[in-house]
Structure formats: C-alpha cells, structure tokens
Amino acid sequence: MNKKQKVYVGVSGGVDSSVALALLKEQGYDVTGVFLRVWQADFLPCDWKEERRSAMRVCATLGVPFITLDCQEEYKKEVVDYMIAEYSAGRVPNPDVFCNKFVKFGVFLKKALEMGADFIATGHYARKFSLAHSSASGLYPLSGGSDDTSASECAQENFFQLCESVDLNKDQSYFLYTLNQHQLSHTLFPVGHFTKPEVRKLAKKFGLSTAEKKDSQGLCFIGKVDMKDFLKHFIQSKEGDVLNTKGEVIGRHDGAIFYTIGQRHGFDVIKKSSESGASFVVSKDIEKNTITVEDRESERNTTYSTKEIILKNINFISGVEPGFPLKAQVRIRYRQEKQSCVVLKTGESYKIIFDAPQSGVAIGQSAVLYDGEICLGGGIIDVA
C-alpha cells in the first residue's frame, strides 16, 4: 500500500486556508495544519492569538494535527524592516510579496520539508500547471484539474507554471511572482480552482467555523492597520507642502514618505485655493518633502504618466530567461487590468515599454509579467 503524501497546510484562521486543509484531507493526503507565528508590534492589537485559536478549531473539526511554527525573526527582518527601510528612502514597497517570498514559501517551506512534508499548501487564489499538460489551445491542470500532484509526478514533470485563479477578482498571482521551480514543485493551491462563493459553500459543507468569517485585509499577517500610523512608530514625520500640478501650494501634509503615488488621499487644503477634498498623489519629492496632487475627475494630466519603467532584476518563474524583445502583459499594481507591453534587456536591467501611457507608477512596487493567464514573473520598479 502506498504511503500517503504528507502536506503541511498553512492555516491562518481564515476561510480560504481552512477549505484548503479540508479539501486536501478529503483527497486523501496526510495533512497537518500549521499556524505561522510572526512578529507583531506591541502597539497593535494582539489578534494573532485569536487567529491561532480559530485555526486550532478548524483542525479539531477536521480531526487533523495542529502545530505552530515560529517565524517571528524572519518576518521582522525580511518584511517589516525592509518595509520601513523602503518607505524611509521614499519608495513604496509591497510587503505581501516579501512575506510570500521569505516567510510562506521561504522559512515555512524549508522547515516543512525538513520535518518530512512532501508539500506545503496555502489558501492563495492561484493555480499550478505542468508544462507537459500544455497545448496550443490552452493549459491543462495536473491530475485532472486539481492540485493533487504526486511526488512521482513532481520528479518526472519538473517544470511548472503559475497561473491566475479561476476567480479573477480574488486572484493572487500578482503577489507570487517571486516563486521558483523548487518552491512550485512542493506547493499546492487547492482553492485556486474555485470562486470565493464556492469556497464559502465548501466551508459550510465541511462544517467549518470560518465559513462566514470576513476576509482579512491590510498588511500580510498583521491585518488592517493604517500604514501611516504604523510607520510613524519607526519613522519621524515632518510636515511639508502639498502642491497642485501648477506648482502652487494648496495644503499641508505630514511627511512625503507616507504617501503613495496613485493613491487617493485627503489633505488640509488652504482655503484660498480652488482645490478641495480628496486628491490623487501624482509625484513626490523626498528631498524637498513635497507632494504633488491632482483631481482625477479633471482632465488627466499626462505630465505624470509614463510609457516605460526600469526593473533592476526580473525573476522568471521558469528559471530561464525568454528571448528579448518579449511581448507580454504587465500589472504595476494589484488588481490592475493587464497592460500590453514589450520587455527589453538593457545591460543588467530590464525596460518595460507600455503600449499605452500609465499613471500612478510607484517606485518600489512590483511589475508582474503575464502571458495570458500564465504569470511569467516580475520585479521591483526602480525607475519610472
């Protein structure tokens, strides 16, 4: 009799990871629920204990083992410290990308394999495919459309593709572009073939207490926190001028580093100006500590749009660089509609040229490349 394959499932206390655990148990895997304990600032509510209890209840309902894995050191160093350093330098990092890279698919995967697991699994909305099951007319999932790849298949089918989930509104491939072939070969995405409503129905079917639980939002693992308030505990704030696109002072802000290009913000607007209410940040000058805003309802100001960006590095999930120039699609922010582009290699860096000008490009954010539903990889925006 073949030994059951062992899967360590990252359980956060939410509905997606709970259903991932239940599905894999139903499919016959030897599953263990793993709660990742990460660093949390002492000034934040201590929510992790309740989330851990929620994850434990799910494991108890399903009758599967539960363990807690300490990832505090890695999370603090690779996610929080990096985020603070990037904001201090005037860039806008994406902590979820680094949480996936260094924590979920870094230390968690490493320790799971050391403890004898064949795979880890998460509640991410994404899908994994084998190149051997690709065809000119589309891509075919491993093992009849589910993430139940066997270890023998992994040995034989050693090339994997990361694809968007069935539920495009929930798709998280944007945050997973740093994955490599080794990580993908040992990772399962059980909920990637379902829509969110279907996942909630499955949670009810399995009798899980998380079935009606609201989706988590905000910073990876920490939850919904005001980023500006969070950063002010680590970075000194300094007031500066808010400018309109004519260079006129129209208000005051509490620190240029706290604001993100393209995002909607409210400011204390000087009454003598015609501008009022919420505006969109189109540029910021860290040295002068000024930010420039425009009203997106007015005629779009093309001065702050760009046709190209530069990335220092690109992680190609395949492990092999494609030929250049490369025609592809790209997202420069989460849930953005994919934009047609051409990728060029210029020395040690990469240039992405958009078919149409893009506004709201933030240095430090991720540009993620696609070929249709296939996530090719991506990198950090260095110049825009």
Language-model-detected regions and their locations in the chain:
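AMP-forming adenylation/ATP pyrophosphatase catalytic core
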Residues: 121-127, 142, 157-384
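ATP-dependent adenylation/nucleotidyltransferase module used to activate substrates
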Residues: 1-177, 188
